A protein has these predicted regions:
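PRPP-associated nucleotide enzymes
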Residues: 1-218
C-alpha cells in the first residue's frame, strides 16, 4: 500500500529493519572501540538502509519517458519528502538521506536535553512555516525517552506537516511508548528496539552518545 503525503495513521506503526547488513553495521556502531571516522561512515551507511525502508510506501506517480529503444512509462515520487535531522546527532544521517532524496528540502531542529529533567530545549528551529501537508522524515539516531522526538514532531505538526516518518537507529521501549502516546508521529523505522533506559535516560545496551561519538566529545 502506498500513502499520500497527507495521510495520517490512526495509531503509530513501528517497523524494525531486520537485515544482515543493518545488523552488522549496528554491531560496529555499538562497539566501544570503533573510532570516530569509522563511526561516522557506518552511521551514514546504516542511515541509508533505514531511509530506503522508510520510503518504501511513499506515493509515486507515472511518468512518460523515452528509452534508447522507445517510449515507456516509469515512475517518479509524487511529492519529495522534507528531511529534518534532529541536531546534533541527526546530522550524521543527513548525507545518506539526501543521497537518496537529492531534491528534498531540509529543515533543522536543534534540541538539548536537560540532564536533570530529561526534557528537550530547542536552540535551533528552521522548520518551514508551512509544510502544506508534505511528508517529513525525522532523522535521529537514538529514540531514548522520546521527549526530543515528540517535541520535533509537534513543531512539524504546527507547520501543517502531513505524514511524519521517524527514522532512528536505536529505540528504547519507553521512547516508543512516549512517541506513540503523543500521537505526533505516524510511523517509526528503527534498526533495533533495545532493552530499556538506565536511570539517567540512556539506552541499554545502546551505543553511548551518538553525538559525542561522531564529533569527538567521547
Amino acid at each position: 500500500m502506498r500513502f499520500s503525503s497527507a495521510w495520517h495513521a490512526p495509531v503509530m506503526q513501528v517497523h524494525v529493519v531486520d537485515h544482515p547488513l543493518v545488523a552488522e553495521r549496528l554491531t560496529r556502531l555499538r562497539e566501544r572501540g570503533t573510532e570516530r571516522p569509522e563511526f561516522r561512515q557506518v552511521l551514514k551507511e546504516i542511515s541509508g538502509f533505514l531511509v530506503y525502508e522508510a520510503t518504501r510506501e511513499h506515493a509515486i506517480a507515472p511518468v512518460d519517458i523515452d528509452t534508447p529503444m522507445g517510449p515507456t512509462v516509469g515512475v517518479r515520487l509524487a511529492d519529495v519528502p522534507v528531511v529534518v535531522p534532529v541536531m546534533r546527532a541527526g546530522l550524521g544521517m543527513l548525507d545518506a538521506a539526501l543521497g537518496l532524496l537529492p531534491d528534498a528540502r531540509t529543515g533543522f531542529v536543534g534540541l538539548k536535553r536537560d540532564e536533570e529533567t530529561l526534557l528537550p530545549h530547542a536552540y535551533v528551529n528552521t522548520v518551514p512555516e508551512d509544510l502544506e501537508g508534505r511528508e517529513v522524515l525525522v532523522l535521529d539516531p537514538m529514540l531514548a525517552t522520546g521527549g526530543s522526538c515528540v517535541h520535533t514532531c509537534r513543531l512539524l505538526r504546527a507547520s501543517s506537516a502531513g505524514r511524519i516518518v521517524v527514522v532512528c537507529v536505536l529505540s528504547a521501549p519507553e521512547g516508543i511508548d512516549t512517541l506513540r502516546e503523543s500521537g505526533s508521529a505516524d510511523v517509526l523505522y528503527t534498526a533495533s528496539i533495545d532493552e530499556r533506559l538506565n536511570d539517567i535516560g540512556f539506552i541499554l545496551p545502546g551505543l553511548g552518545d551518538a553525538g559525542d561519538r561522531q564529533f569527538g566529545l567521547a
